[in-house]
């Protein structure tokens, strides 16, 4: 049975993964601190975005499915909220808008009834 030298392949493997994770050295061939570690090539079928989240364009892309966002739009119109970031409303924001709308329609009675 062959023995694996402790200072041989394990150190080389450690160095390999350390370089892939992104540690930079002064002898880097690119010469820029902007590119550290392995550069992942951009797929030509995916649009380039500043956020770096390719999956966000996949899920929340340009396609407009029928019936999408109508609940959020109605909630915004009722509560008077106008600003929407990138046309997206998260579940948390939607809950907050609905809660504010219900509290304003109650006139604060729910808070007074609890005390």
From Swiss-Prot:
Region Disordered, residue ranges: 21-48
Record's keyword annotation contains Manganese: no
Family affiliation: Belongs to the PPDPF family.
One Pfam family here: PPDFL
Function summary: Probable regulator of exocrine pancreas development.
InterPro entries referenced in this protein's UniProt entry, alphabetically: PPDPF
Protein name: Pancreatic progenitor cell differentiation and proliferation factor B
Keywords annotated in UniProt: Developmental protein, Differentiation
Gene Ontology biological process terms, A to Z: cell differentiation
